[in-house]
């Protein structure tokens, strides 16, 4: 009888410890309120989007109470129009949209406006790496206004120091004084749009110019968080980068 009581006590203690650990993990999350719904749109040229999607969603879900839906369509070329946007309510089920796609040569203005009009009406977004070169051949500026930056080219791959200069912004909380990226591409920023605010920069090894690499933007009534880094698998393995994306997503959704 005594042995049964001891076993039961040990069992209860283990369960209490497990519950306490779970609660501790929840408290450490950047956001642990009502579960957010996020849509990740990915696909296109030049990147390992299958790996990136897994690293991004699993990494952010550890830090934020969020559930991802992933749409990877359009193939691996530079030109595509995905059927998602044919539905005018394509973004309605989601609290925030993550763009990590690469379709530089898609130029149809009506197609592009199907995307940007939804964001301008208030749907928050996170934009990563080649999203900045997506639709770059288009004549209209709608996508670039949405991003908050204009970029048409990048420099060589290197390990670039990232220097924060908006340290008081909640997205940058806990960001290292100088984070050095894994091998990644530095995007040349030709223009910062009026409603965008840089949060960190890197310096070109070729020209010595500073280029914004992390920023926020207001597009219509939507919050947009962006970073030009995210080319390599190694970047998506870096906990500093995943934490940055998690904080950026939470901020865009007005939960930070």
Task: Write out the residue ranges for each language-model feature.
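Bacterial N-terminal signal peptides
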Residues: 5-15
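Boundary at the C-terminal end of the N-terminal hydrophobic targeting segment
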Residues: 18-22
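Extracellular ligand-binding/catalytic regions of CAZymes and related secreted enzymes
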Residues: 23-35, 62, 92, 206-211, ...
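Helical hinge/lid and interdomain linker segments adjacent to catalytic or ligand-binding clefts
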Residues: 30, 37-41, 49-127, 131-133
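Extracytoplasmic/secreted proteins, especially bacterial periplasmic and envelope-associated proteins
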Residues: 40, 51, 55, 110, ...
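Active-site rim elements
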Residues: 43-46, 157-159, 231-238
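Catalytic beta-strand/loop cores that center a nucleophilic Ser/Cys/Thr
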Residues: 61, 65-67, 156-224
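A glycine-rich, often tryptophan-bearing local segment used as a flexible ligand/cofactor-contacting loop or short
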Residues: 104-174
